[in-house]
């Protein structure tokens, strides 16, 4: 969806692909491989969001994980936030699960209260929402909460690890998509993804002193 200018410490900028190129990439893969799930993260432009929505409506059989990325963990902007928020409305009803952090959840809904904001997503057509609490002011732990069809299904608390991590949200959403592709329910997929992510974060490596930690995924 985009070429980014970044290193292990921050995002400096990006150039989004055209919607035509995005759809060409998607159709090339679909014509070659037995796709079962789609995960999106940074989309960059409203045109790309609309193109993805068009593609997903053509393929309702695919599981879809929406990670509504607006800002990188390092603080770098990944698009015009106000414009992208309005466009994400088109993708929300198409997703099997949405995985916002609390900053993204508040931006998507315009509400500060997390419970009210989560319910607002369901009013917008969401099926399931995993609220990630890494940006909240809880120095000792991180709390994630899973909601399905408007109901609070489960939550996890894990010790807050020291440092900043590069790609943790992307890794979590991708793992969920992989488990959904294998036939897991949303609840089971999230459980496996959270367990796996905590393990790879504990083994994360720092390429350069002062940089973000990179999850050891393999």
Question: Which residues fall in each region the model found?
Answer:
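Conserved N-terminal subdomain of the carbohydrate kinase-like
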Residues: 1-75, 218
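Short pre-catalytic strand/loop immediately N-terminal to key active-site residues, enriched for Gly-Thr
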Residues: 152-166
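Short beta-strands and strand-loop turn motifs
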Residues: 35-37, 65-73, 99-106, 131, ...
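Short, small-residue alpha-helix embedded
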Residues: 107, 163-186
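Phosphate-handling active-site elements
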Residues: 152-154, 179-193
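Charged C-terminal helix
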Residues: 187-218
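Conserved phosphate/ATP/ADP-binding segment of small-molecule kinases
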Residues: 81-153, 195
């Amino acid at each position: 969806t985009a070429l980014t200018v970044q290193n292990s410490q921050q995002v400096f900028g990006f150039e989004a692909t055209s919607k035509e190129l995005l759809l060409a990439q998607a159709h090339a893969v679909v014509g070659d491989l037995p796709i079962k799930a789609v995960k999106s993260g940074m989309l960059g432009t409203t045109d790309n969001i609309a193109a993805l929505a068009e593609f997903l409506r053509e393929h309702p059989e695919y599981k879809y994980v929406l990670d509504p990325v607006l800002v990188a963990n390092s603080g770098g902007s990944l698009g015009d936030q106000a414009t992208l928020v309005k466009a994400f409305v088109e993708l929300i009803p198409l997703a099997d699960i949405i995985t916002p952090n609390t900053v993204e959840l508040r931006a998507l809904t315009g509400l500060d209260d997390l419970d009210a904001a989560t319910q607002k997503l369901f009013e917008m057509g969401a099926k399931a929402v995993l609220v990630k609490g890494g940006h909240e002011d809880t120095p000792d732990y991180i709390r994630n909460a899973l909601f399905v069809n408007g109901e609070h299904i489960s939550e996890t608390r894990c010790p807050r690890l020291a440092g900043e991590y590069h790609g943790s949200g992307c890794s979590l959403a991708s793992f969920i998509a992989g488990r959904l592709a294998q036939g897991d329910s949303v609840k089971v997929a999230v459980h496996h993804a959270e367990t796996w992510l905590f393990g790879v974060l504990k083994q994360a490596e720092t390429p350069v002193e002062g940089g973000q930690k990179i999850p050891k995924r393999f």
